[in-house]
């Protein structure tokens, strides 16, 4: 295995982007034009925001894209100095063999408010020579003056079928055997995050020559979906002690964290409602309890105590 698979199998062209067809179709209109508006890509991690941005830059700027492209991660450079120095100095330079320059700011929702206001001023000042592509997980953390200056593209989680097809393609390319159960397990744990899926696949493949369920569970340290399902079924049927014992076994033997356990409980409950196996009014009450449990664990409360308290709400 040579290098990270997320880089080796990263799509290089807009046509190869997975799971964001409507967005790609809209972006294709900018290719070949002499101008591009400021763009904002928003959505969860691992759904192709950075990959799409770089593919778009290559398509628009052509062979001179490296000379006219600046990529910064706002998590590493959060402050106003980055805007005043790196971005301003780059924007002042004339484009080389291209109509304009492009600045890509990743995780811009981690920038301070002062830095965002400074960025807004740079976006106004260099409209004729540079365009910005901003990427964030939460657009609500971006100040309104920046949002109003961008065409906003909202990326959604990648469908399970598309993730599964990509994983099978990688396994075939790397000459690794896989089972449908192994691919389904990765799909379940990825929750629409292609980057996570590929990373788990590579980690599972390093355990042996076949990617199966056991190899996946070995590397993710999360509860098996069936165990979570059985736990909730016991709680709903009134068997609190049975559910409690299964919870403890799952957290100790499989090394599942409290936050992951809450997330998996939420997944199972949501699936039951979607399949018509749980009444909506019961679901509403449980979601409130799950949200409260999640908040308390993230605030530092004992995960096992909070999860056992959560199980009492299922009775």
UniProtKB/Swiss-Prot annotation:
Domain of life: Archaea
GO biological process, one term: DNA repair
GO molecular-function term, one example from the UniProt record: ATP binding
InterPro entries the record matches: AAA+_ATPase (IPR003593), ATPase_AAA_core (IPR003959), DNA_pol3_clamp-load_cplx_C (IPR008921), DNA_Rep/Repair_Clamp_Loader (IPR050238), P-loop_NTPase (IPR027417), Rep_factor-C_ssu_arc (IPR023748), Rep_factorC_C (IPR013748), RFC_lid (IPR047854)
GO cellular component: DNA replication factor C complex
Residue numbers binding ATP: 43-50
CDD domains: AAA (cd00009), HLD_clamp_RFC (cd18140)
Keywords: ATP-binding, DNA replication, Nucleotide-binding
UniProt similarity note: Belongs to the activator 1 small subunits family. RfcS subfamily.
Functional description taken from the UniProt entry: Part of the RFC clamp loader complex which loads the PCNA sliding clamp onto DNA.
Quaternary assembly: Heteromultimer composed of small subunits (RfcS) and large subunits (RfcL).
Descriptive protein name: Replication factor C small subunit
Protein's organism: Methanobrevibacter smithii (strain ATCC 35061 / DSM 861 / OCM 144 / PS)
């Amino acid at each position: 295995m040579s290098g990270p698979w997320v880089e080796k199998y990263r799509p290089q062209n807009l046509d190869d982007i997975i799971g964001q067809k409507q967005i790609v179709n809209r972006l294709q209109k900018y290719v070949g034009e002499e101008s591009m508006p400021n763009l904002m890509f928003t959505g969860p991690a691992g759904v192709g925001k950075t990959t799409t941005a770089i593919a778009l830059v290559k398509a628009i700027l052509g062979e001179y894209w490296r000379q006219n492209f600046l990529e910064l991660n706002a998590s590493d450079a959060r402050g106003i100095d980055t805007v005043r120095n790196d971005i301003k100095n780059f924007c002042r330079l004339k484009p080389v063999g291209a109509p304009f320059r492009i600045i890509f700011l990743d995780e811009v929702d981690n920038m301070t408010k002062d830095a965002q206001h400074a960025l807004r001023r740079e976006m106004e000042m260099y409209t004729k020579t540079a365009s910005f592509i901003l990427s964030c997980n939460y657009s609500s953390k971006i100040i309104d003056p920046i949002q109003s200056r961008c065409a906003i593209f909202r990326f959604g989680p990648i469908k399970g079928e598309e993730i599964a097809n990509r994983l099978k393609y990688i396994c075939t390319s790397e000459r690794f055997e896989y089972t449908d159960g192994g691919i389904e397990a990765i799909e379940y744990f990825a929750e629409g995050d292609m980057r996570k899926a590929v990373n788990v696949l590579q980690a599972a493949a390093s355990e042996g020559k076949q990617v199966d369920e056991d190899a996946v569970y070995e590397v993710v340290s999360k509860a098996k979906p069936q165990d979570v399902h059985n736990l909730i079924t016991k709680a709903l049927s009134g068997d609190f002690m049975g559910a409690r014992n299964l919870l403890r076994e799952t957290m100790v033997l499989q090394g599942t964290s409290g936050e992951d356990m809450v997330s998996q409980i939420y997944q199972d409950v949501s699936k039951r409602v979607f399949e018509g196996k749980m009444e909506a009014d019961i679901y509403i009450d449980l979601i409130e309890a799950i949200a409260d449990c999640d908040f308390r664990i993230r605030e530092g409360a004992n995960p096992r105590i909070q999860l056992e308290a959560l199980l009492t709400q299922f009775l």
